[in-house]
Amino acid sequence: MTQSVCILGVTGSIGRSTLKILGQHPDKYSVFAVSAHSRISELVEICKQFRPKVVVVPEQKIAELKTLFAQQNISDIDVLAGQEGLVDIASHTDVDIVMAAIVGAAGLLPTLAAVKAGKRVLLANKEALVMSGEIMMQAARDHQALLLPVDSEHNAIFQSLPHNYLQADRTGQPQLGVSKILLTASGGPFLNHSLEQLVHVTPQQACKHPNWSMGQKISVDSATLMNKGLELIEACHLFSISEHFVTVVVHPQSIIHSMVQYVDGSTLAQMGNPDMCTPIAHALAWPERLQTNVPALDLFEYSQLNFQAPDTQKFPALNLARQAMRAGGLAPTILNAANEIAVEAFLMERIGFTSIPQVVEHTLEKLENAAAESIECILDKDKVARSVAQQYISSIGG
């Protein structure tokens, strides 16, 4: 019997990799619903191949999609719009597995809807957990949802932890003999740049990651190390561990995807070629394993693996994220919102690369923190933080 999959963000990098895995295992999985934001022609090609029952696009893309469907004689796919449509497909009774791969805060409500519907949720949208934190984790416990990490680092940590770790008490302290999590970072394309060189970085340069094929936003986040900061917050929530038990290690080759240290002196690592198909396949099939076309790691290709501490003087975003996690409450929401606005401004060449963390720091300092008591107050603070960040960008000439 096949399992029914909903892919939120199907035309993005994670969505396309997910389709690649599903296409290799039609006996195990079928595509029930997909969503896309802007690449409508690509979405139509996906629909022709995988024949989902439902598609969700923004309201302003409905007419374009229906026109293309008519040209291709596609009449058996329901079309829904906007956030309401995303929530509908993420929580649909016919869906078994939800791939949460929408980038940014836009993925929060549909991801939470999938969790509250008790789905197996493959979490690629780190921003949803950064914003909602313990609300999301409590919802997963209350509704018996299975929240499995797809980020290569968190998937590596999950594989390196004891098999029953997620069922351990959520105390903020390491459990079951774990002493520390080592979260690896490639260091991004500007690892060896000077501060002076970083000032002149272009969006085109920032979007060229040395090891991974990714979308624009996450590529820029990787270049600033904000991606690692967001992943640190995500790790703290997923694995119920305080931030001072998580150490970021720069590992330029991206072969070791993260590590877990134990009280007996052991360090367990998950290794593999940098290909998102591996963690996606793992999360889809866990606790079983799926065949993929990813080649096994050839250790003889690597004469050495390098590790170093991150330079937080050059890349202050990492410390900003750590401080936001330490502060708790709505601070991670403010951090994420300001970063999304700053990255968008950088990609539009309104601000420089080194201004991205400045926008985030200003917004964190400007806004008062408070307890994250509900999704409504999180969304309200997200909106305010975006406005403050926009105002600051305008004030510095962006």
UniProtKB/Swiss-Prot annotation:
Disulfide bonds: none annotated. One of its GO terms (molecular function) is 1-deoxy-D-xylulose-5-phosphate reductoisomerase activity. It is an enzyme of class 1 (oxidoreductase). Pathway: Isoprenoid biosynthesis; isopentenyl diphosphate biosynthesis via DXP pathway; isopentenyl diphosphate from 1-deoxy-D-xylulose 5-phosphate: step 1/6. 1-deoxy-D-xylulose 5-phosphate binds at K126, S152, E153, S186, H209, S222, N227, K228, E231. Its EC number is 1.1.1.267. One of its GO terms (biological process) is isopentenyl diphosphate biosynthetic process, methylerythritol 4-phosphate pathway involved in terpenoid biosynthetic process. Coiled coil: none annotated. Catalyzes the NADPH-dependent rearrangement and reduction of 1-deoxy-D-xylulose-5-phosphate (DXP) to 2-C-methyl-D-erythritol 4-phosphate (MEP). This is 1-deoxy-D-xylulose 5-phosphate reductoisomerase. It comes from Acinetobacter baumannii (strain AB307-0294). The lineage of its organism: Bacteria, Pseudomonadati, Pseudomonadota, Gammaproteobacteria, Moraxellales.
